[in-house]
């Protein structure tokens, strides 16, 4: 009888601890679709390289610019900051009220990177930058570049070091 009570007590104790732990863990996760961090007035993102209409080699450097906001890594909840997301050949924008998914077409730069080496197949491509907050959710209002079009060609001239 004492053994059963002891086992029941231990079982309830373990169950209670699990429920409390689960509640604490979910408190640290960003709410999905419930909040968008405000962006600074006049905030913008753009490409330093490449530019719209450029012909680039299959492997090339993409450099991001941000104005009016600071850069902070994903997970760092700091007002007026965020990090870049690169949209590659995206024809339909994702839901701006939800965290951006990480896919081959939506690249996350959650460490605060402002440059990346990109390799694309030859042909026409589009690139667009989207700035998002600590939880990968776009700001409100959205801070997004215009879409640029580039052509990837093995015959592209090497980048001019003076232009970068």
Predicted features along the sequence, with ranges:
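Short, well-structured beta-strand segments within conserved domains
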Residues: 60-64, 114-116, 123-131
């Amino acid at each position: 009888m004492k053994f059963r009570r002891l086992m029941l007590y231990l079982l309830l104790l373990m169950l209670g601890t699990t429920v409390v732990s689960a509640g604490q863990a979910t408190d640290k996760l960003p709410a999905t679709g419930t909040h968008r961090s405000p962006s600074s007035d006049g905030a913008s993102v753009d490409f330093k390289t490449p530019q719209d209409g450029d012909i680039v080699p299959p492997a090339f450097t993409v450099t991001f610019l941000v104005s009016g906001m600071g850069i902070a890594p994903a997970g760092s909840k700091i007002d007026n900051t965020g990090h870049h997301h690169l949209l590659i050949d995206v024809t339909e924008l994702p839901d701006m009220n939800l965290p951006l998914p990480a896919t081959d077409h939506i690249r996350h730069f959650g460490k605060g990177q402002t440059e990346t080496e990109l390799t694309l197949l030859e042909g026409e491509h589009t690139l667009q930058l989207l700035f998002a907050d600590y939880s990968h959710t776009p700001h409100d209002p959205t801070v997004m570049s215009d879409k640029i079009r580039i052509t990837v060609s093995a015959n592209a001239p090497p980048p001019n070091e003076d232009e970068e």
